């Protein structure tokens, strides 16, 4: 064997060792690159989860509102949310100041079928409840007759206050838990004027989308209604994801079940005592009282308002008068007489009010693809 061949044989181990070293270096480099990619992806994912919506811009504004037509009210709302959620916008609003207030009847929930839901609850208590109808007072019975007149389209002066007083008395001495169950039992029955719907399911689905949309953009949602506060709590339980403390409504007194007529200043609440309805009306949460309760209970001026009647006018004007963050006020028009128990004359008056007061109208007839869901239909009117 010549020296040249011997030289090649002698170099083989060294070449193999060098090849192995290069292979291991390449593997290590690949592993480092892969690890770096995973680390970067992990950091990005974690940052995305921890970054508040208020710092992410308007990505969330594309969520929901699928039950709305491509209407002016929808455009106004979406454009507004896009402006106030962009950190670099001059109109940016911090999360803690993003507050929206909603009326209930006719704004989130069916207003008349044929009358307000709390009117129907009172009628049932006085005229049908086997445990109470024989105890009903003459004033309560007279109020029921006024409600029947109202159902037929008559104007009954002062009915809202008389009903609130009579209603409070009709449920006196009932515990809060008992009242909650009573209301829910009543709401579990079929809706009088509709097919395939229970009384408690008569929420406007497009408006529930608005609430979801606003909550996705870090809004605090409040209900501010003329309906009794504890009735609303029972109604929205499991339907709208807001704390009980975010519900503002008509007030009646609450006492301890051993308190009797002892003054609040003199009575000491007992351990393990329960709370009951005293049966005494305090205030109807309508008109200027809505502004009063908003500033008392929320402590800030909201930036969005949703209502449907003159009872919501003060609330609407309060919101659009916000000097720190100019707000928007929306008003629903009850102009759908096919899918809903609408009132065209009333809707036209509200539309005029919207034009005069810079409120944004929402047409139930033209702006919504559905009201209660396509499976729900209005019964034929006799």
Q: Where are the language model's segments positioned?
A:
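C-terminal cap/substrate-recognition subdomain and adjoining C-terminal extension
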Residues: 13-21, 41-64, 82, 177-382
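Charged, low-complexity surface segments at secondary-structure and domain boundaries
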Residues: 58-67, 149-151, 164-169, 337
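Non-catalytic pre-domain segments flanking phosphatase-related domains
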Residues: 3-12, 20-104, 112, 119, ...
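Electropositive phosphate-/nucleotide-binding environments in soluble metabolic enzymes
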Residues: 71, 173, 288
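Residue-level detector of functional hotspots within protein domains
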Residues: 63, 85-88, 92-94, 160, ...
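A metal-dependent, Asp-based hydrolase signature
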Residues: 113-200, 205
């Amino acid at each position: 064997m010549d020296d040249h061949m011997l030289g090649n044989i002698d170099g083989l181990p060294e070449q193999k060792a060098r090849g192995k070293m290069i292979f291991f270096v390449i593997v290590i480099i690949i592993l480092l690159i892969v690890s770096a990619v995973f680390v970067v992806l992990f950091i990005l994912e974690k940052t995305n989860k921890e970054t508040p919506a208020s710092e992410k811009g308007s990505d969330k504004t594309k969520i929901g509102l699928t039950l709305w037509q491509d209407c002016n009210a929808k455009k106004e709302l979406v454009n507004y949310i896009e402006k106030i959620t962009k950190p670099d916008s001059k109109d940016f609003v911090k999360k803690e100041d993003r507050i929206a207030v909603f009326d209930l009847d006719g704004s989130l929930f069916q207003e008349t079928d044929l009358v307000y839901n709390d009117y129907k609850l009172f009628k049932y208590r006085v005229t049908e409840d086997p445990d109470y109808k024989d105890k009903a007072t003459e004033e309560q019975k007279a109020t029921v007759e006024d409600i029947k007149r109202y159902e037929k389209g008559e104007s009954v002066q002062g009915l809202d206050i008389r009903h609130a007083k009579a209603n409070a008395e009709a449920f006196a001495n009932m515990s809060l838990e008992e009242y909650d169950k009573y209301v829910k039992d009543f709401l579990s029955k079929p809706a009088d004027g509709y097919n395939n719907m229970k009384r408690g399911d008569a929420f406007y689905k497009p408006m529930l989308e608005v609430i979801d949309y606003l909550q996705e953009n870090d809004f605090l949602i409040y209900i501010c209604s003329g309906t009794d506060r504890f009735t609303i709590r029972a109604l929205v339980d499991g339907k709208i994801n807001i704390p009980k403390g975010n519900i503002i409504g008509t007030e009646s007194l609450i006492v301890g079940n051993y308190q009797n007529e002892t003054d609040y200043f003199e009575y000491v609440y007992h351990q393990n005592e329960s709370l009951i309805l005293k049966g005494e009306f305090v205030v109807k949460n309508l008109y200027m009282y809505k502004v009063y309760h908003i500033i008392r209970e929320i402590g800030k001026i909201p930036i969005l308002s949703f209502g449907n009647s003159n009872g919501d006018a003060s609330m609407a004007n309060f919101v659009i008068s916000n000097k720190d963050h100019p707000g928007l006020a929306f008003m629903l028009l009850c102009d759908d007489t096919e899918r809903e128990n609408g009132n065209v004359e009333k809707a036209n008056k509200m539309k005029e009010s919207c034009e005069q007061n810079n409120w944004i109208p929402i047409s139930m007839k033209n702006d919504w693809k559905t009201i209660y869901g396509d499976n729900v239909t209005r019964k034929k009117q006799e």
